[in-house]
A protein has these predicted regions:
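Short, structured segments at the rim of ligand-binding sites
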Residues: 1-424
Length: 424
């Protein structure tokens, strides 16, 4: 699908509600499914990723009833016999969270996916499974695991995706003995680990840090049903936040001030760039201000990478984004994808491994004659949409349907901010 993104006649400005946090929703759905009894999860958006997790929960151990923006999840207290593979679509969270849970089912479980999902590395789990002589088979067609994980000590790198750590956090407390996770420094994305722990605690399962790199997971625990309201998503709010910082006149609602989301770092990053904004409760309002480049550490907030590359083009001076290696292993190689599309618009930037250097060049940006490529990546498409609006460029972007993965209503929600969308 081709989508043309243009500035609306009224220019930039308006109010937008942050969509529900996809990260928190994944976690709440799985905790509810593992509980015995009915949980009610409110403030949901049924993106492809969340729909994949809900579908997997229903296939494994729960009855799921969805409403307009909520879901009732009835944990059955036992695992269902599987008659088909578990389809994770393109959701890395769904797959990596469920692999350890699958070890509790007492049966072989095959996962399938689409896009680049089955190409994404799972070596952390593969090593753990092979150490315990469990079945772990991965190919481009799917991934099959079989056998029960045992309680005990687990050592894994702290600088790989926190999704592996969260997956073990979900499953190990249900085993009969205590377990410890020993994370080899540096520990990145700690905020996502603590988000998992906080959601688990709401459902009655607890863990604690023994020191900066060791987690204790007491065994013999049980998830309990509860009513859970999902926060607004800071990683998605980053798109209108960058637009507001550049152009002013944008208010974002639904952003909890006391959040555990690591992507709340977007506000600190924008403040360091010179952005002018005020917070009132869960709302943040931006005024236009001159922006300058800064040095950004992406270790705890990798999802911000693509839109921060757009921000760098629109700041004065140079922006350096460090510890961005994991961007190469997402739905696309996000560094290469954004470099290619931003250069097509006149952007000046380069990368070396996990370091991206972006040179402010707003005055030389232009709309290329050929369509830009969305690389089947929701964050690439939304970042290019911000560029179109903030730099007043009438861009054409393909693969725009990729937004269905995380924020299906993005274009409609962004319309009041001055982003006009037409099918091309």
């Amino acid at each position: 699908m081709l989508v043309t993104i243009r500035l609306a006649p009224g220019g930039i400005g308006g109010v937008i509600a942050a969509p529900p946090s996809k990260s928190m929703a994944h976690r709440a759905v799985l905790c509810a499914a593992l509980a015995v009894g009915r949980s009610h999860i409110t403030h949901l958006e049924f993106s492809k990723d969340i729909s994949a997790t809900l579908s997997a929960a229903a296939q494994l151990c729960a009855a799921v009833d969805t409403g307009a923006d909520d879901a009732a999840v009835q944990g059955l207290g036992h695992f269902l016999p599987l008659t088909a593979p578990v389809d994770c679509c393109e959701s890395g969270s769904t797959l990596r969270f469920l692999i350890p849970i699958a070890s509790l089912t007492g049966q072989p479980v095959t996962f399938t996916g689409r896009g680049r999902l089955m190409e994404r590395p799972q070596s952390v789990y593969e090593t753990l499974y092979r150490e315990q002589n469990l079945r772990f088979e991965q190919s481009s067609a799917g991934l099959t695991v079989e056998g029960a994980l045992t309680p005990g000590d687990y050592r894994l790198a702290g600088n790989v995706s926190s999704q592996f750590i969260s997956g073990l956090l979900f499953a190990l407390p249900l085993l009969p003995g205590d377990s410890q996770l020993h994370l080899i420094p540096p520990v990145e994305s700690r905020s996502y680990i603590d988000m998992t722990r906080a959601v688990q605690a709401a459902f009655g399962v607890h863990s604690r840090w023994l020191d900066a790199t060791t987690l204790l997971l007491p065994g013999g625990q049980q998830y309990h049903p509860c009513d859970y309201n999902v926060e607004g998503d800071y990683s998605q709010a980053a798109f209108p936040a960058v637009l507001g910082a550049v152009c002013g006149g944008v208010t974002i609602t639904g952003l909890a001030p006391d959040t555990l989301q690591g992507d709340a770092a977007i506000l600190d990053i924008l403040r360091r760039c010179g952005a002018a904004f005020t917070r009132k409760g869960d709302s943040v309002t931006f005024a236009k201000a001159p922006l300058h480049g800064v040095d950004i550490d992406l270790a705890d907030c990798p999802d911000l990478g693509p839109v921060l590359m757009v921000l760098g083009l629109l700041c004065e001076g140079t922006t350096v984004i460090r510890n961005a290696e994991r961007l190469r292993l997402k739905e696309s190689d996000r560094i290469a994808a954004m470099e290619a599309e931003l250069r097509a618009c006149g952007g000046v930037l380069e990368s070396d491994g996990g370091t991206i250097t972006v040179h402010g060049c707003a005055e030389r940006l232009h709309a290329p004659a050929a369509p830009l490529h969305g690389h089947n990546d929701h964050r690439v498409v939304m970042s290019l949409s911000v560029l179109a609006a903030a730099a007043a460029l009438p861009l054409t972007v393909d693969d725009a349907e990729a937004i269905q993965k995380s924020w299906p209503g993005f274009f409609a929600d962004a319309a009041p901010l001055g982003v006009e969308v037409e099918d091309a």
